[in-house]
């Protein structure tokens, strides 16, 4: 299957207006996303189809166990403790059912796409969002904000 990146890019540009939220930043996986990330960072001018949109702060999230372990562990703990809330989403639940975690030699936990039982993209995107949230808490202002996974 192929993906129409223009549809995804437009969806992201329209999130603020559609949901009444403020996008604080976008974390992305380098694989197949560099062009989109550059467009999101630069923003877009108004045209007959779309209003103008300011650029966003974008940050590559390295897809490595040493980077994603803290977010994966915290998300797992939040789910286990019943502290994780989300909008009803059957596809996200299926992605969680498919996900298989493994540990590297340093006991860093990560979702292993090759060992998973099917699609896990939404879970990985959620882990990336949790990573961004943790980075903001550690290095940015202590803002109260959440994440949306598309």
Language-model features, listed with the residues they occupy:
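Short, surface-exposed amphipathic charged segments that create phosphate/polyanion-binding patches used
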Residues: 71-81
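RNase H-like, metal-dependent nuclease domains and their acidic two-metal-ion catalytic environment used
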Residues: 1-63, 69, 73, 86-150
